[in-house]
Amino acid sequence: MEDEIKSFEKDRNLIIEDSKNSKNNIVDVQKLIEALKDEKNAKNIVVDFTEYNPLHNGHKYCMDFGKSEGLFISVIPGPLERSGRGIPYLVNRHIRAEMALLAGADLVVEGPPMGIMGSGQYMQCLIKIFSALNGDIIPRGYIEEETMERVINSINNGNHIKIKPYNISCIETREKLGEKLEIDNYVIASMSYTIYKLKENFPKWNPKFKFIERIEGISGTKIREGVFNNNFESIKHMLPITTIDVFKNFGDNLSEIILKRNEEMVLDTVNNFDLNKYLPENISEKLNEKEYYESIEEIKEYIPRGFSKNNIERTISKLEARIEKETISKYIENYPANLRILNGINNHE
């Protein structure tokens, strides 16, 4: 846990430093990518964002589909090692990058710190990094549903999607496409919408989506349970052999690589710091009603009702990170301040 705390603090400082935009290596990395593209005689640069928590057969299926279009770059979040659900990833991004490379990715790049951002914030970061990587193709797996078929047709016709509660529509034609989308399909619509919103920032960038229906029979929850229990026999049908090998290479030390929450940091923040600097006003005011917290569960009980489980966990991650809201805003504004390549289990800037 001590090494994990040190890594967390290093990531925290990295985010703060990037918010200042003190240096920028984007052009150098773009040259590296172009050289790799030429070396592999690839027609396009394919960019995909996936958490790989861990990398399973569904990810491998989409990766193989994307690789058929060109040089495949996996963008993996990211500093602090907290997922979009606000909880610690199973293993750190360097191990997840190794899984991606062994599964067939040509390059793995570090993405944004999802666990301390709202969905709109990290989606904005994703589109910015896709553009910085000069991505030509964005492959996405989708779940079949009627509204999604209309969304795909609209995007394939060169249009963009607008998302509002109970109103999924085409921006260009103003046609209503449906009322709701399954959460993973919603991500695709949100990507399209964010590309439209940021188009003035990247007037020469016009990426194309490539869609493939997701395969069934894979449960991330069951996979993580199998890893926790060191029971790979029960989950081997859902994982590429390369992912299983990465885990098995740790042998009896497997439990040591499983990431955990730094609860002491969370409690120290909530009990001793000005919460207005880190949290939305309505949440900080509610938490300030109690003078002292003794557990994470107590904190969760005081977070206002109406927030999703993921939002609650992201609040805990914000307390854990202890990075001021203003710093996060500057980080997003400057993103990506740098492009960091994750090469196997080593991090090279």
From Swiss-Prot:
**Disulfide bonding pattern of the chain:** none
Residues in coiled coil: none
Query: Which InterPro entries is this protein grouped with?
Result: HIGH_NTase1_ass, Rossmann-like_a/b/a_fold, tRNA(Met)_cyd_acetate_ligase
| Any one Pfam family match given in the protein's UniProt record, by short name | HIGH_NTase1
Q: Name the family the entry cites.
A: Belongs to the TmcAL family.
Q: Spell out the protein name for this chain.
A: Uncharacterized protein MMP1471
**Organism whose genome encodes this protein:** Methanococcus maripaludis (strain DSM 14266 / JCM 13030 / NBRC 101832 / S2 / LL)
